[in-house]
């Protein structure tokens, strides 16, 4: 008789179709692939996109509305729109992150393993077009009219482009998953000229390593960038008293 202890099975989890749709739309919002005041496709169009009923789509949209991510508007200019992040939303996000801080630490650790190796592979495989994209993201991020939201969107695009350039779809998927987890925390970071300048500097370092097709330097620079980002999130979210307690 086989010993059940030898198996690593997971219990069946029946995910509703509406939950599946909600997760995909929420991921796109978190990753800034849709920005505030962008209008979602109509319920009918979403039903066609997801091959689902309009009732199911409506359930998914109601869940997103309850989270404060979208708003349904009526009238001549009605529709469903992405809502901007408010101060209250920031407060809720911080509370949610701190309630499950151990999970965030696991994500930081996972990111440290995945993204530097993605940069290593990208240095060998990146195309001229992808390098041009990365450069354009850096240029846009330091423009005077670059909003906080667009700055965050450009940061996501920069990292996802490198992941795609790795040529490994599993790695690209992993980086999307990582960004979905850490983006709410990054949205809490300050936005000013110093932040923009620091971001430009480290992204330029990564870009130069990729342009040189230097795998080791690309990996090391990305690893340094990720460590700095994790430290910044920690310093922003964890109070000095909590930090002292964690160090004892």
Model segments located where?
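C-terminal effector-binding regulatory domain of bacterial HTH transcription factors
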Residues: 1-11, 216-248
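Short linear motifs at protein or domain termini
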Residues: 1-110, 120, 241
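Non-transmembrane, amphipathic alpha-helical segments
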Residues: 99-102, 126, 191
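Conserved amphipathic alpha-helical segments that form helical-bundle/coiled-coil interaction surfaces
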Residues: 107-188, 198-205, 217-231
